[in-house]
Amino acid sequence: MENYTPHQARYFAEQINLKRSESTIEGLASAMSGVKVDLNPHQVDAALFALKSTLSNGALLADEVGLGKTVEAGLVLAQYWSERRRHILLIVPASLRMQWRAELSEKFFIDSIIMESATYNKRKKEEIPNPFDCTEKVVICSYNFAARRTAEIHSIPWDLVILDEAHKLRNVYKSSNVTGHKLKDALEKVNKKLLLTATPLQNNLMELYGLTSFIDDHVFGDAKTFREMYVTVANTDLRNKYLRKRLQNFCKRTLRSQVTEYVRYTNRIALLQEYEPSPDEENLYNGISDYLQNEHLYALPESQRNLITMVLRKLLASSSFAISGTLDSLIARLECLLKGYEKDLDLSDFDLFSEYTEENDENSPTNNHNDPRAERKKDYIGIQKELALLQRYANLAKGITSNAKGDNLLTALQQGFGKIAELGGQKKAVIFTESKRTQDYLFNLLSHNGYEGKIVFLNGVNNDSISKEIYSRWKKRHANDGTISGSRTADIKAAIVEEFKNEASILIGTEAASEGINLQFCSIIVNYDLPWNPQRIEQRIGRCHRYGQKNDVVVINFLNNKNAADKRVYELLDQKFKLFSGVFGSSDEVLGSVETGVDFEKRIAAIYQKCKTQEEIQHEFDELQKELAAQINTKIVAARQSILENFDEEVSIRLSDCQKNTISSLDTFSQWMYYFFLIHGAERVEPLDMWRFKYKSPDGTTKTYNLKWKEAETAGDIFLRKEAPFFKAWLAEAINAPLSPVNILFDTSKSKRKISFFDSHPHMKGLLSIDKMSYDGLGEEEHLVFTVTTKDKTKLDEDLINRLLEIPATITGPCQKESAAFSKQRSKNLYKQQTQIKKANKQYYLNECEKLDAYSEDLKNGLERDIKELRKEISVKKKAFKASTNLPLKEMLDLKDEINKLEKKRKEMQRDLYDKQDAIDDENDRLQEEIRKKLEGKIVTEHIMTISFEVV
């Protein structure tokens, strides 16, 4: 067995725990080493950009769709979390809350809490004064919920706030953007805001002003000045060049075409399965569609009429089984109304109903039930007629035992499996539906047609016997390997996905239950129900068509040939949004043109609701296509390319360097983890290879740990992270253990790794001192300062010192005494490190001063603009006066009085101008003084160890 010393354990513990500058790859390595993400250089580059300076109030990450902005933000979040800055808020669209929660848990091992009405009220009952005040978990909430709880959000000293789909805020400068204004005010004190959007600039340059001012009000002046300086200008090339310079420290955008060297994109291949419904199915569809178009309906609460109508249309298109159960709920409500009281509708079959309700609340905040007393006053005869009609449709639905679309699914799967076999993929397909009843129908249909025992499904509950059995086997299989999280929801999802990967051929998933899962081993996606929201379709396909997918992906869709509206919807999604074919899927311009997918869904629903003839349907969809075309502004696309995007060659060089440095830093960090585990674990640890060990814990169980997450998953090992409780305890033990100055003998013959340098310098002797310098000012950072001298004057750099301390060693006696020259060199090295910290701070200071000076100039230009406008007005009045010789004397005198008053006002404004300019300069000085105080900081030095050494 190899011997090591407590001094070596302390050294590696210090390196692992060291707070490096977070704007460097070395500083991010600690966070990167503990995540289950196959990192790409553009993601690391973006995270470093966002972390680069605590002086900056935040950043806008605007990579194209599909490049992993979630991972970029997750790295920033993980860095904050590892530094115990844990007041973190995520504001996202309601539809993405669960996906973010799953990503944080599965990839970054960070727990989160979704703050919604139920959670908020529960925490209030637990006597938590501010339910948002949480440091043991990341808080996730929707835009709408955040806007309703601004007082609570404002009162918390957030360390980091991340806003996904941040284009919702690009019009925050407009008074009509109520939600944006509320959030901006609520987050005004936050030091770091991270905005994520693939479409930062869609319609006009004022959107860039809105997003930048949301991050930092001290970048540009007011909206009017920005418009005058950057929007209404003749020389757009000069404008773009200047804007690019102003925004380069706040906005970062990478294109998919720039990362193809690192991210392998496979193709999407579309298969369309057309079908014709049976006469009964068509009668059911047309009958319920006509019913929903009635002006007054008693079964639908008026306050949610539009929302519920849209949901019913989706269930109607899904399957007769989906609408059948929902008709029963409508009937039950009408029967209760006849008895004089109200009953809630049960729409739980629609997977996303609660999410849709949350989104709907944004535009309908007072979404209350109808007053039962008002219900009783309604026309009982009308209610009875409606009840009879729905009972007739319910009976018709129950009489339909098979669906044409379902029968065609069998054909489509055969074609899909045939195609994927040609492409070299596995015989696996994921089928998406929005209805749980449709999911049950498909399970039974496929089980009776050759797929029995090969199907698994996800629906958010998974209480069926098959899922329970899969879950039970999974728990036994992973009983001792650290895979089980303890959360049934997360664990059963992991169990189902593992079963699908290793055993099953088909996964039937409802929408919400399938969020956050990665299925890159599957190459067929079946949209059994086709959502109207293009962003949701992109998310669905992205479950399989993502980084790590080795094969082209087949996307199967269904089209009812007898439904004119369905045809036009498919045409839009396929030809306009280009969702189903090609390498990249939908473009940012097109996805961005719909603003939010939910709004687009409502637009589609409105067409279904009001159009009764084919001519009306064609006209409305033609108008919608014109609207979408108008929203893609080619001039704005060109401006975005000029202002926000970098030359491919520049990006290529930067990403190449980032890739090399990331690999190097992660390998170094993993080696520190390896040697610390080996040294501190001593006889309890058996190394298997460079990244794997067997460890016998105090309770007698033996576990295999792996420092590489991918290899850990393949081998069934436990992924070792420095955040593991026992590992954190070991680090604390090593750092707190007292160390005496000693002499250490390093024996290269006992090392399993060949270190050529020390082999070529036998019997090297020397003295080594290690100090830790901590700086607390512009953020916190720590540096290890090495002072070393050797008897033969050989120079050892930090890398060689690191290699030296990896060699097995024993303590042989006391340390040799420090010479005066050595002490002097040690002081010199500490001073040099202090100078380097100040040098880095100087650059931050200059950047911030440049930003504030430009901001001040904007404000001054705004002041002068008002005087210029007044001068123009005076000039117009003077011309009118000269031309007024034919007017009566009184009117001429009145006009002259107006001119005199305006001249007087101009003189007053001119005098005020100097005072206001002085005030702006004073404010600039005050802000710069605040920065200077931050930069001064506090520097503390701690001596770690001094050893004399000999290498044999």
Task: Report residues per predicted region.
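Conserved Helicase C-terminal RecA-like lobe
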Residues: 36, 265-277, 325-503, 652-701, ...
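SF2 helicase/translocase NTPase motor core
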Residues: 1-48, 52, 70-71, 81-179, ...
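P-loop NTPase motor cores of the ASCE clade
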Residues: 335, 633, 637, 650-862, ...
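C-terminal accessory region of SF2 helicases/translocases
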Residues: 2-9, 551-710, 714, 720-723, ...
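Conserved RecA-like P-loop NTPase helicase motor core
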Residues: 142, 452-566
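Amphipathic alpha-helical coiled-coil segments
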Residues: 901-921
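Walker A/P-loop
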Residues: 56-76
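Inter-lobe coupling linker of SF2 helicases/translocases
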Residues: 129, 135, 139-158, 173-191, ...
